[in-house]
Amino acid sequence: MARSIKKGPFVDDFLVKKIEDMIKTNKKAVVKTWSRRSTILPEFVGHTFAVHNGKKFIPVFVTENMVGHKLGEFAPTRTFGGHSAEKKVAKAPGK
């Protein structure tokens, strides 16, 4: 279910404040966050966020294509080990 347009996108206040401060001081630093639920705003483009995936922080560099998505979409929480390999059965000679 989509979020109501009148409510606007959800972004944690501390993220907006940190990015605004960085824009004012013309700084580029990695912003460490646990807020996977925050929506990426146009002001975030060009900045790097370290998004927690439950175990470690994954660096996410924000581009224009990411605007409107959530930060958590770019920090996968599960590792895929691959499917088990199918064992080859040796064929009997002459068959």
Swiss-Prot record:
The keyword Zinc-finger does not apply. Signal peptide: none annotated. GO terms for cellular component: cytoplasm; small ribosomal subunit. The keyword Transmembrane helix does not apply. GO terms for molecular function: rRNA binding; structural constituent of ribosome. Transmembrane segments: none annotated. GO terms for biological process: ribosomal small subunit assembly; translation. SUPFAM superfamilies: Ribosomal protein S19. InterPro entries: Ribosomal_uS19, Ribosomal_uS19_bac-type, Ribosomal_uS19_CS, Ribosomal_uS19_SF. Keywords: Ribonucleoprotein, Ribosomal protein, RNA-binding, rRNA-binding. Protein S19 forms a complex with S13 that binds strongly to the 16S ribosomal RNA. Belongs to the universal ribosomal protein uS19 family. HAMAP family: Ribosomal_uS19. This is Small ribosomal subunit protein uS19.
